[in-house]
UniProtKB/Swiss-Prot annotation:
GO molecular function terms listed in the Swiss-Prot or TrEMBL record: DNA-binding transcription factor activity; sequence-specific DNA binding
Designated name of the protein: Trp operon repressor
Protein family membership: Belongs to the TrpR family.
DNA-binding region: 68-91
Subunit structure as annotated in this protein's UniProt entry: Homodimer.
Amino acid sequence: MAQQSPYSAAMAEQRHQEWLRFVDLLKNAYQNDLHLPLLNLMLTPDEREALGTRVRIVEELLRGEMSQRELKNELGAGIATITRGSNSLKAAPVELRQWLEDVLLKDH
C-alpha cells in the first residue's frame, strides 16, 4: 500500500473537514427551507443532472431488474459510473441500504 506524505494526509483531512462543513451548511439550509437555493448556488446544472442520474442508478441497482449494460443504455451514463455506484452500494452500511430501499422503492 502506498504511503501518503504528511502533506497529502493533511490535505485529505482538510478536504474532509470542508465536506463536513458543507454537509452542516446543507442541514442548516434544510431547516430554514433554503436548501434548493443553496444547491442551485453550489452546483452547476451539469452537477445537479449528474446527481439526479446517480440517484436513478442507485434506484435501479436496488430494484435489480436491469443489467448494468441495460442501465447504461437507459440512462446514458458510463459503465464506469454504474460500476462505481454498484460497488459503493455493496460497501454501504446495511442501514443506509435499507433506508434507500424504503425511500426509493416505496411506491414501485
